[in-house]
Amino acid sequence: RVVLPDQRGTGRSEHASAKSIARRGDARAQADYLKRLLARSIVRDLEYIRLTEFGGRAWTTLGQSYGGFLTLTYLSFYPQGIAASFTCGGIPHVPASAADVYAHTFPRMAAKTRAYYARYPEDEARMAAVADRLATGDVALPDGSPFTPRRLQTLGGGLGMKPAPERLHNLLDTAFETGDGSPACAGSTPELTDGFLMAVLQNLTTAGNPLYWTLQEFIYANGTLDAPIRWAAEHEYARHPEFDAAARPLMLTGEAAFSFMFEDDPLLAPLKPAVDLLMEDTEFDEIYDERQLAANEVPLQAAVYFDDLYVDSGLQLD
């Protein structure tokens, strides 16, 4: 029998949204609730299901990406609940650190961007033309939210998977009402097509996954932190001037949460006060027991993806 659980806050497991989280109370109450949607609580749920619904029979687990993180949490605290485990692209670095993750993934994202432009040379100028148009500050997506160069950069989030490069290329091909957006083709103020703006919104919307960016950096928080997370990706971004939205070629960002997302996205904006509090917190549930993992006797097979954009292969192999 295959069991595919909806993790806390997703699917039919009391789906979380800005509206439902707001009902929890003030920003502090919301932040504390969001902490209950992380790995330690998810694994407790799975262990409860194992004991109450499956007669205590040990699982054989398969964890992809974040599922691998959950696997190590499970093996840390309830190893008796697992007969064997398999992970794919999902061995977190232990001890975990959001800062370390982004220090590794931003150089990978720069390389992915350059590879994309090498494959589609015309897209370097086209992406720059879109960014230049957005820099005027008067472009909105169909939901009314501002479309900025920083939001444009986040379209690179899919470049770690196939066929994302092809999709991004096709998207840019429809960007402008006239030509490629250059002054020679479209004049001094090129217009973006409605179809392009809608496709961008469909790519960026968090309507179906509000927790994805909300909890992005907190999945690395393990117990008592030495220092608050304080927008780790934002700090790493600032360390790389080539990623500045005014720099050319325009570099794209990957799986990284930024504070502007919680200002520009109307579905995330209500969560910003709670997320800001979490960014200053240093007390989280412990999610990995290094001693237990070092003594692990449960069979574990791990597949590590070469040049993984999301879970750095170097950190996985360390």
Language model: regions and residue ranges:
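Gly/Pro-rich cap/lid or specificity-loop segments adjacent to the active site
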Residues: 1-143, 267-272, 285-287, 291-292, ...
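Short, flexible loop segments at the rims of nucleotide/cofactor-binding pockets, characterized by
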Residues: 38, 276-282, 306
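Generic secretory/membrane-interface signal
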Residues: 39, 258-259, 302
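Pocket-edge structural micro-motifs
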Residues: 63, 156, 304
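Alpha/beta-hydrolase fold active-site neighborhood
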Residues: 138-281
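Conserved alpha/beta-hydrolase "acid-adjacent" motif
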Residues: 164-168, 308-315
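Short beta-strand/loop motif that positions the catalytic acidic residue
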Residues: 296, 301-304
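Catalytic histidine neighborhood in serine/cysteine hydrolases
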Residues: 318
